[in-house]
Amino acid sequence: MEIERINEHTVKFYMSYGDIEDRGFDREEIWYNRERSEELFWEVMDEVHEEEEFAVEGPLWIQVQALDKGLEIIVTKAQLSKDGQKLELPIPEDKKQEPASEDLDALLDDFQKEEQAVNQEEKEQKLQFVLRFGDFEDVISLSKLNVNGSKTTLYSFENRYYLYVDFCNMTDEEVENQLSILLEYATESSISIHRLEEYGKLIISEHALETIKKHFAS
């Protein structure tokens, strides 16, 4: 994937269809399956944020152009008006001359509703994490700490170990406390669980930390 930072509010990136398939997505389903296309978009935006420090805040203006061998995507963040009272989308001059099918306020309202829905989905997803380890010894060290209450699955992918953690039925405080322990031995990864399931190697399907402790941490 190629990323180009246009300015403070705009970033452009190009993804070949090979890039898309390498991430575990089918080139056809991204057009017809909204859930999967959004999953791909936010996975890519996480990488854009890491590489370009492009934080996604507020409504977005998104242009997608289908090319012969991939997609070119331009993402622009809405900006506050000079009086600080209204969000404005920096639409290019050539687009402003085209007949608008919707009033800008209505368009922004739709963006805000979409953003609220995304935020709610992200809040729910924050009960699940993918963690990357430097080596297997770090996984063993973590298993000795008796981190309980979460569901854990271990994968290997591209010579790294990844632990999928599901903090189901845990309070925000419990999640925060356990995550702080986990992050002493691992780093949070932007790789999705779907990509690990598709391209990674499943090592331990459930109770991963308990199993590792039983066999390696005696």
UniProtKB/Swiss-Prot annotation:
Transmembrane segments: none annotated. Gene3D superfamilies: 3.30.70.1950. Keywords: Competence, Sporulation. One of its GO terms (molecular function) is protein-macromolecule adaptor activity. The keyword Electron transport does not apply. The keyword Hydrolase does not apply. InterPro entries: MecA_C_sf (IPR038471), Neg-reg_MecA (IPR008681). One of its GO terms (biological process) is negative regulation of sporulation resulting in formation of a cellular spore. Enables the recognition and targeting of unfolded and aggregated proteins to the ClpC protease or to other proteins involved in proteolysis. Acts negatively in the development of competence by binding ComK and recruiting it to the ClpCP protease. When overexpressed, inhibits sporulation. Also involved in Spx degradation by ClpC. Homodimer. PANTHER family: ADAPTER PROTEIN MECA, ADAPTER PROTEIN MECA 1. Belongs to the MecA family. The N-terminal domain has binding sites for ComK and ComS and probably for unfolded/aggregated proteins; the C-terminal domain interacts with ClpC. This is Adapter protein MecA 1.
